[in-house]
């Protein structure tokens, strides 16, 4: 059995990313790309908490669909999170590094990222009996 404190630590870090993004979004901060990135990070850490909790073979990856696939091997119902993970996955590379194509994220996209991250967070935390 995995030490529950490790799982709680992953979830706490996910909560920090979510709350940081949420506060900045609500305050109308102009850093939309970073807000979207932190919503991605929240979902990533939730998925990793699930992987650790069920000893599913931790991998160093930021690819949400790949992490979700590992989680869904344990609980196929988690596949319902695929659209959210696919959407959030677009915010990892493009928000962190210079790219050679135009990138501009809107507040509406950040709101959708919030909704997707919240869906992942709620489903995973409920599944872990932490909600």
Q: Where would I find each of the regions flagged by the language model?
A:
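Terminal alpha-helical segments
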Residues: 1-131
């Amino acid at each position: 059995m995995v030490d529950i404190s490790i799982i709680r630590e992953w979830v706490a870090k996910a909560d920090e990313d979510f709350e940081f993004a949420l506060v900045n979004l609500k305050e109308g901060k102009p850093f939309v790309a970073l807000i979207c990135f932190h919503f991605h990070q929240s979902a990533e850490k939730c998925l990793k908490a699930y992987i650790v909790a069920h000893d599913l073979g931790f991998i160093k990856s930021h690819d949400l669909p790949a992490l979700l696939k590992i989680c869904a091997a344990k609980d196929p119902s988690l596949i319902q999170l695929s659209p959210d993970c696919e959407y959030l996955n677009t915010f990892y590379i493009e928000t962190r590094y210079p790219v050679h194509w135009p990138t501009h994220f809107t507040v509406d996209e950040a709101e959708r990222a919030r909704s997707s991250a919240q869906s992942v967070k709620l489903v995973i935390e409920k599944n872990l009996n932490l909600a």
